[in-house]
Amino acid sequence: MTAEKPPRQTLKPLDDALAELLGFAQPLTGTEQVATFEADGRVLAQELASNLQVPPQDNSSMDGYAVRCADLASGWVALPVSQRIPAGSTGAELAQKSVARIFTGAPIPLGADAVVMQEDCDVQADGMVRIKAAPKPGQWIRRAGEDVTQGAVVLAKGERLTPAALGLAASIGLSRVRVVRRPKVALFSTGDELVMPGEVAPEDMKPGAIYNSNRFFLKALLTRLGCEVSDLGIVPDNRAATIEALRGAAQSHDLILTSGGVSVGEEDHIKPAVQSLGHLDLWQIAIKPGKPFAYGWVGVDAPVTAGMAATEAAISALEGASGAHFIGLPGNPVSSFVTFLLLVRPFVLKLLGCTK
C-alpha cells in the first residue's frame, strides 16, 4: 500500500499577491526640499499651486504686427510702424492708425486687439505696412492666464516629477520643491556560483560559475525609482552569513532586496534566515517566470506573527517597528526582472506615496 502524497501547495494568484504586498507598503513620512533642477523622478510631498498666471500678460504668438482691428475695417490699408516690441520688453499704448512691430512672446501693447502675422503683411519702400487680410479681434494673441491661472494647483501631492512637470514647476517660479525622501534599499545577491564581471575572465571561470547580472539591473532599476541603494554585493551560501547580512541591513534601511536563495533547495537559506529574524507573509506566487518570490519583515523583534495577512492589525504593528521590509527575488535573471517590474516597482512607488 503506497503512502498518500501530501496536498500540493496552492499558490497565490498575482493580483492577490500584489494587493497584499501593497497593503504592507505604508508611505514614508520623511520629506526634503531639493532644487527643481535635481528633482527629476522624485515624488512631490505637497501640492504645488501657482502664485502667478502663465503667461503673465497678453502676448503675441507670432512674429508680425500688433494692430487695432477698427483701423483695418475698410480692407487693404497701409499704416506706419509706431514702435517695435521685442520679447522681454513692454511697448507703449498703440497710437491710432498705426501698427507695432511685435515678436513672439512680446506683450500686446495697450489699444491693440489683434496680431497680423508678418507673412500677411507687405512692407513698402516708404516703411509703411500694408495689411493683406483683415484680422479678427484676438487673432494670434495668447491671453494672460491661458496656460495657468493664479491659484491653480498645477501638480498634485504624490505626483512623480517628469521632465514636463519640472518645466511646469519652473514656469511658476519654483526653484525648489518639497519631495518624499528617498527610500533606503539594501541590495545583495546570494550564491557561491556568482562572480563579478571583470574579476574573472570567461576562460578562467570555474565549472558552474556564472556572472552576477542581477546586481547590475536591480541597482539600476532601484536608482531610476529614486531609491538610495546600498550595494552589499554577494553573500555566501550559508545560513549564518545570510542572517548576518539581513540583520545588518535591517538596522538602517527601509527595504532589503535580495536575488537568489528563495526556493526550497538545501542551499536556499533566505526563508529560514528571514523567519529567524522576523517573518514571511508571502511565499511563492502563481506566475511563471517568477514563482519563487518572497515578502516579509526583518527585525530584532518580529512585529507580527509569521504569515499574518496585510490586515489593519498587521499594518499597525509595522508602524514604528525596528527593522525593514524584505523582498526576495528569484535568482534566475528573467524571473528576477519580471518580478521586479510586477511587484517590487509598485511596492516602492507605494512607499514613496506615488498616486499614479
Task: Please tell me what each predicted stretch does.
Residues 109, 163, 264-266, 335:
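Short glycine-rich, flexible loops that bind phosphorylated cofactors or substrates
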Residues 2-12, 65-231, 236:
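Short, glycine/charged-enriched hinge/interface segments at domain edges or termini
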Residues 112-114, 166-167, 196-202, 242-244, ...:
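Short acidic, glycine/serine/threonine-rich loops at helix termini
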Residues 8-11, 15-18, 32-41, 45-46, ...:
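Flexible glycine/proline-rich
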Residues 9-76, 160:
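Intrinsically disordered, low-complexity, positively charged segments
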Residues 215-292:
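Acidic, glycine-rich loop-and-beta core segments that form the ion-binding/anion-interacting portion
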Residues 1-21, 222, 255, 269-275:
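N-terminal intrinsically disordered, low-complexity, charge/repeat-rich segments that act as generic
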